[in-house]
């Protein structure tokens, strides 16, 4: 059963959890990031992203701009694109003249950096215009274009303004000429433009953009490998160029329909799979969809962390092999979990099965939210499940897994990505087709459907387990609400009367078909009992350990609550207990306690004497809130004794 996500403007958040997160992004995160992109905050990692675009515009107007005036990564433009997209979604919540003015000025500047033929990329315009389109593998021209296409579609949908949409349509036309008529064997080094072209096609109706997206999917990985040949012939490199080309990293080892295992760079992988799933949906390509299902199984059944993190190593920011899920040398990039949400949503649009929304929820409420500090001013790129200050971020094997969030990064892909995901949450929470309105995630606020009814959701999720929807308007239609797999005992009522879930539930959704009337209610009560979770015996890193999950939230132990975390053991057979909601703690949480003990340390490195243990109640907090109280030890998985 196929579906479409709702437009971002169709959802308006209330002052619940999601509403507060969106308010934080709107009032704090976006202005902060805009200042960083303009290099207006001293003492932190320089961005220069908007200045690069200004330099490109000046060069096109005839100013003598030196190549070394460009600063930053080859994909620096994409930081600006993601910020514009996040700002667009924020504007859907209400007017903000100052924010809209900042976006409009940035768009005007970006338009001034576009070449006559539609090409637009500040790195090549400023630094090496003679090398445009000569390094498709590494140079990120298509990646940057894709992100700006997404921004253009978002800004047009929210504001009705076409300037950026026209700029990126011209850019897409340029890309079409280059890759459909000239270099027809090439495909993006970093997938992104595929999913973006599909969005641009929906916004403009231009069939060329869907055709190009499908082309990029179809030619990827065909023999002989394009990237191998390109590297032999191009004569220059973005990076040092000495390493052998890793086709797993570039998602080009096999044609996409032959891929079965998620490999290589995790963000590239899930961005590619998102584009594949979208193309499969819109072209009714069952072979391509079958490949997407195989890749989904590979990730979620064998290569995903309990937190919805993906990518097990900093070596290539990549997937490794099945069940290799180390907790301390993990990568689990924030962008990768955002990309996993993209992929999950597209699979959900192909076939409405609860497992896709379950993973989307797991990724969002754990890894994605952990990627941003509670004040919105610091960010994680990497999301470890175990941290020991002095080792984490210090030892060469642990250098990527930091114990605290930096203010910014030289490679700052994650901060604006979190902002756009939080701001667009409504379009992930709901979807619909001609017959059914789907509630995929629980988000407090009001959502307008195309069925003639409006739903207002009151929920205490994710810390509470109730979600009540009040209907406004009248229509005979179906509302399908997801029953989460983690809820062992769920209660669904319509106008206060219990529904037999066994009779109405299919693939994780309860389907309620009726003549809905003004004032009708649909209420879901979920089981929020905290549970001990055991890992598969195939995961070496978690052998003999357990973690705790309550609802969608994975919990962790932090040193600030428990003293040193490394000596802690959970008592065998202990049951976790949820405490009362603490509104003043970490923005408002429900802590969990579990019985355990702490191993007393010894004076030597090793000893033949058995250690002593003292009983201890272990306090746990939601994983997304960790590292908000200074540098300290943290663990998700705790050994059992």
Regions found by a protein language model. Name each.
Residues 127-203:
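A conserved hydrophobic secondary-structure block that centers on an alpha-helix together
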Residues 1-79, 104-124, 162:
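Low-complexity, Ser/Thr/Pro/Gly-enriched N-terminal "stalk/linker" regions
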Residues 2-3, 58-80, 96, 131-144, ...:
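Solvent-exposed loop and edge beta-strand segments that line ligand/cofactor-binding
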Residues 15, 22, 34, 84, ...:
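Hydrophobic core segments within long, regular secondary-structure runs in both alpha-
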Residues 281-302, 325-377, 388:
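Catalytic-core region of carbohydrate-active enzymes that cleave or remodel glycosidic bonds
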Residues 10, 213, 292, 358-366, ...:
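C-terminal beta-rich recognition modules with glycine/proline-rich loops and embedded aromatic residues
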Residues 18, 84-97, 146-161, 194-206, ...:
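Well-ordered alpha-helical scaffold segments within catalytic/enzyme domains
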Residues 487-513, 532-538:
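Solvent-exposed beta-strand/loop surfaces of large extracellular or lumenal domains
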């Amino acid at each position: 059963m196929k579906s479409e996500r709702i437009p971002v403007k169709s959802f308006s958040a209330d002052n619940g959890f999601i509403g507060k997160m969106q308010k934080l992004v709107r009032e704090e995160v976006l202005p902060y990031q805009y200042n960083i992109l303009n290099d207006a905050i001293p003492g932190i990692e320089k961005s220069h992203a908007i200045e690069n675009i200004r330099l490109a515009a000046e060069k096109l107007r005839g100013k003598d701009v030196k190549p070394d005036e460009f600063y930053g990564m080859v994909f620096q433009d994409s930081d600006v694109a993601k910020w514009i997209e996040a700002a667009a979604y924020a504007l859907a919540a209400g007017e903000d003249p100052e924010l809209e003015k900042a976006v409009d000025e940035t768009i005007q500047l970006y338009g001034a950096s576009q070449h006559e033929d539609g090409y637009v990329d500040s790195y090549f315009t400023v630094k090496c215009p003679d090398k445009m389109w000569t390094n498709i593998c590494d140079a990120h021209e298509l990646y940057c274009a894709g992100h700006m296409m997404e921004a253009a579609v978002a800004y047009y949908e929210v504001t009705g303004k076409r300037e950026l949409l026209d700029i990126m349509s011209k850019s897409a036309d340029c890309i079409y000429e280059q890759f459909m008529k000239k270099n027809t064997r090439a495909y993006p080094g970093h997938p992104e433009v595929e999913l973006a072209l599909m969005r641009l096609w929906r916004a403009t109706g231009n069939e060329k953009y869907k055709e190009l997206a499908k082309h990029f999917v179809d030619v990827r990985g065909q023999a002989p490998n394009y990237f191998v040949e390109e590297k032999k012939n191009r004569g220059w490199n973005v990076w040092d160029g000495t390493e052998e080309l890793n086709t797993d990293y570039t998602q080009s080892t096999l044609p996409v329909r032959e891929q079965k295992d998620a490999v290589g760079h995790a963000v590239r992988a899930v961005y590619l799979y998102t584009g594949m799933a979208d193309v499969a949906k819109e072209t009714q390509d069952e072979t391509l969809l079958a490949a997407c299902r195989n890749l989904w199984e590979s990730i979620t059944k064998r290569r995903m962390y309990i937190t919805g993190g993906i990518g097990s190593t900093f070596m290539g920011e990549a997937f490794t092999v099945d069940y290799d899920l180390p907790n301390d040398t993990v990568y689990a990039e924030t962008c990768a979990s955002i990309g996993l949400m993209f992929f999950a949503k597209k699979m959900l649009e192909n076939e409405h099965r609860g497992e896709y929304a379950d993973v989307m929820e797991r990724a969002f409420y754990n890894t994605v939210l952990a990627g941003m500090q509670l004040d919105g001013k610091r960010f994680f790129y990497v999301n470890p499940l175990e941290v020991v200050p002095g080792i984490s971020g210090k030892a060469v094997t642990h250098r990527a897994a930091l114990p605290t969030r930096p203010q910014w990064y030289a490679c700052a892909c994650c901060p604006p990505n979190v902002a756009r995901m939080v701001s667009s949450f409504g379009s992930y929470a709901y979807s619909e087709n001609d017959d059914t309105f789907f509630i995929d995630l629980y988000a407090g606020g009001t959502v307008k459907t195309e069925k003639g009814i409006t739903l207002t959701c009151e929920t205490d999720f994710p810390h509470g387990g109730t979600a009540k929807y009040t209907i406004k308007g009248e229509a005979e239609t179906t509302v399908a609400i997801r029953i989460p797999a983690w809820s062992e005992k769920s209660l669904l009522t319509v106008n206060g009367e219990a529904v037999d879930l066994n009779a109405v539930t299919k693939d994780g959704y309860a389907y309620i078909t009726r003549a809905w009337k003004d004032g009708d209610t649909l209420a879901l009560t979920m089981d929020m009992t905290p549970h001990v979770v055991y890992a598969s015996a195939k995961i070496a890193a978690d052998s003999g350990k357990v973690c705790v999950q309550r609802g969608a939230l994975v919990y962790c132990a932090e040193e600030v609550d428990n003293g040193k975390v490394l000596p802690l053991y959970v008592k065998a057979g202990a049951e976790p207990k949820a405490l009362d909601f603490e509104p003043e703690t970490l923005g408002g949480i429900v802590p969990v306690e579990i019985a355990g003990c702490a191993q007393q340390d010894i004076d030597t490195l090793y000893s033949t004497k058995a250690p002593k243990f003292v009983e201890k109640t272990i306090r746990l907090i939601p994983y997304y809130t960790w590292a908000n109280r200074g540098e300290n030890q943290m663990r998700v998985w705790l050994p059992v004794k």
